[in-house]
Amino acid sequence: MIDSEGYRANVGIVITNDKQQVLLAKRLKQDSWQLPQGGIDFGESELDALFRELNEEIGLSFEHISILAKTPKWLRYDFPDYHIKHKQKPVCIGQKQVWFLLRLISNENNIKLNMHTQVEFDDWAWVDYWRPIEDVIDFKKPIYEDMLKALAPVLFNNQHKIPNQYLRPLKCSAIILDK
């Protein structure tokens, strides 16, 4: 679903374990790592999209996770020009995302990347909370930084110091959904 400004509505997913690490996934047949994310279909709620994408990309369902928080507003990023399909209508210039912070409450053996016909990832790893900023494609780095800074106080109970390299002003804070 592309809005009037050219942004595709999307949910982003930060899955954490009991060590406060996050699940980072490797794009199929690429040397590119990212957090799970996916589009919100027409008429679909953010939560419906979250659970659909969680199942399609990671093989998890509602009973495997606990929702901790979400970003309260859309976070946007623009595609580089080479990524924009100018002949496609409507033209999509980027994505606007709402991000959910989840905790895995089941065994990690439930994580299955090949549950659906359109497999997006071929590997995954638990990594340090801030690591996705370093590993994601360059044009997504600012949104990853904003999102992780917004969600960190929830995961770390306001006890975690933001690394110095990410100390630019925060654009939003998280809404706590579950405790």
From Swiss-Prot:
Domain of life (superkingdom):
Bacteria
Report the residue ranges that make up the Nudix hydrolase domain in this protein: 6-149
EC number(s)? 3.6.1.-
* Cofactors, names only: a divalent metal cation
What GO molecular function annotation could you give as one example from this UniProt entry? mRNA 5'-diphosphatase activity
User: Biological process (GO) annotations?
Assistant: mRNA catabolic process
Motif Nudix box location, chain numbering: 38-59
Alphabetic keyword roster: Hydrolase
Q: Give a yes or no for keyword Hydrolase in this entry.
A: yes
GO CC entries: cytoplasm
Its annotated function is as follows: Accelerates the degradation of transcripts by removing pyrophosphate from the 5'-end of triphosphorylated RNA, leading to a more labile monophosphorylated state that can stimulate subsequent ribonuclease cleavage.
Task: Describe the family membership recorded for this protein in Swiss-Prot or TrEMBL.
Answer: Belongs to the Nudix hydrolase family. RppH subfamily.
Name of the protein in its database record: RNA pyrophosphohydrolase
